[in-house]
């Protein structure tokens, strides 16, 4: 099949192929006839400067040191931008490209695209995060309107002004692109982030050993950063274990992030070390074993300017495994889980504990919600239902496939 064109993907958040959404997008475009190149940072176990995986050429650069303050974050973004520009020039010389497709954060890759647009290259902005809202949610409401916040808004505007096409992860983000970004609606497409039905064709069997000697298991999957609410879950666990006297439940928290060590210390300070197990990052097969065994899965992301508008991938993975969910009552949580979750009053940790306990004590409700979530995933929320929208977006940019 003749190539429909060449796409260069830029990302800074995770190495490829670890970033699952990006990898599904790239393989979908490859299967549709595009030649795919990608640039990303290195990360264990993907540390080769160049390799080709499943027909996708990947260039990687060494990651910068972990950032801890505004100056170090600024240096991290500049370092990654310069590395990405260097490799973009190398890709242009070696393979060429017609389209630059960049995922944020950060909102800086538009400046690379702007250098190539005079030469006929087009730019697709894949809007993964609301960076201005992320900054305020992470560092507090007092940061709204400060110089860094205003700078992030300006960088975001650069994305919207430069983009020939915007891909949003949900309708809330699409509204931001059309409203704050002033992008014409016909150039903004919603491509959601559900996991693939192929990956979750079956649900793994329950592994009772993961409950660590107790009859019930509560699980969390995801990033552990200040805005992710894992501290809310730990304080809800303290209510269940110490206030409610529950000795029949274990908690397994899967993932890592900036707050990982701080959260382990908080768990110990709350007297939960016997009940809470932190796994760190683990292979997909082990993640799926934990989720398949969990009696309740929790999405404790608190209400803030970012989370209320964001789709949480953890909810979709819980649904794929047929698990009942407890979450705070946020706009996009309700869109994703619908009737498959119990919703706690936003940011009320005691109500979060109450909703978890309600599910722990009602096996029939757990079963109904789990069946609902599995069915909803298979029938409407899996990646396969979003793949076609990505390809439709590219048809508006590059024209339909000659085989269509």
Q: Each PLM stretch: what is its role?
A:
Residues 341-349, 358-364:
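Conserved acidic donor-binding segment of nucleotide-sugar-dependent glycosyltransferases
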Residues 254, 261-288:
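Nucleotide-activated donor-binding/catalytic signature segment of Leloir-type glycosyltransferases, i.e.
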Residues 172, 194:
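Carbohydrate-associated surface elements
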Residues 19, 228, 285-290, 297-319, ...:
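Nucleotide-sugar-dependent
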Residues 8, 167, 209-238, 252:
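Conserved donor-binding/catalytic core segment of Leloir-type glycosyltransferases
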Residues 27, 85, 89, 108, ...:
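Membrane-proximal helix-turn-helix segments that form the acceptor-binding/catalytic region
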């Amino acid at each position: 099949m003749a190539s429909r064109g060449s796409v260069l993907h830029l990302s800074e958040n995770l190495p490829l192929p670890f970033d699952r959404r990006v990898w599904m997008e790239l393989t979908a475009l490859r299967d549709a006839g595009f030649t795919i190149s990608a640039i990303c940072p290195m990360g264990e176990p993907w540390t080769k400067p160049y390799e080709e995986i499943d027909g996708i050429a990947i260039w990687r650069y060494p990651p910068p040191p972990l950032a801890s303050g505004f100056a170090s974050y600024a240096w991290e973004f500049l370092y990654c931008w310069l590395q990405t520009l260097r490799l973009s020039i190398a890709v242009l010389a070696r393979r060429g490209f017609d389209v630059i497709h960049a995922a944020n954060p950060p909102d800086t890759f538009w400046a690379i695209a702007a250098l190539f647009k005079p030469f006929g290259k087009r730019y697709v902005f894949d809007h993964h995060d609301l960076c201005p809202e992320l900054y305020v949610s992470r560092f507090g409401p007092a940061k709204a309107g400060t110089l860094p916040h205003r700078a992030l808004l300006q960088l975001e505007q650069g994305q919207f002004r430069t983009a020939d096409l915007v891909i949003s992860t949900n309708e809330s983000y699409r509204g931001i692109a059309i409203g704050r970004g002033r992008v014409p609606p016909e150039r903004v497409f919603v491509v959601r982030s559900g996991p693939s039905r192929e990956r979750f064709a079956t649900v793994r069997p329950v592994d009772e050993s993961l409950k660590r000697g107790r009859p019930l298991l509560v699980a969390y999957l995801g990033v552990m950063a200040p805005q992710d609410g894992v501290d809310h879950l730990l304080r809800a666990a303290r209510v269940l274990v110490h206030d409610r006297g529950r000795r029949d439940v274990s908690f397994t928290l899967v993932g890592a992030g900036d707050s990982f060590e701080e959260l382990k210390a908080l768990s110990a300070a709350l007297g939960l070390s016997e009940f809470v197990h932190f796994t760190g990052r683990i292979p997909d097969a082990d993640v799926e074993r934990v989720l398949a065994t969990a009696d309740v899965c929790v999405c404790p992301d608190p209400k803030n300017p970012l989370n209320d508008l964001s789709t949480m991938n953890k909810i979709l993975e819980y649904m794929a495994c047929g698990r009942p969910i407890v979450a705070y009552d946020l706009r996009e949580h309700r869109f994703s889980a619908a009737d498959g979750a119990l919703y706690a009053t936003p940011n009320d940790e005691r109500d979060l504990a109450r909703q978890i306990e309600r599910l722990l004590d009602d096996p029939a409700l757990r079963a109904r919600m789990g069946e609902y979530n599995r069915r909803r995933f298979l029938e409407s929320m899996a990646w396969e239902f979003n793949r076609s929208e990505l390809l439709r977006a590219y048809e508006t940019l590059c024209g339909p496939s000659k085989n269509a």
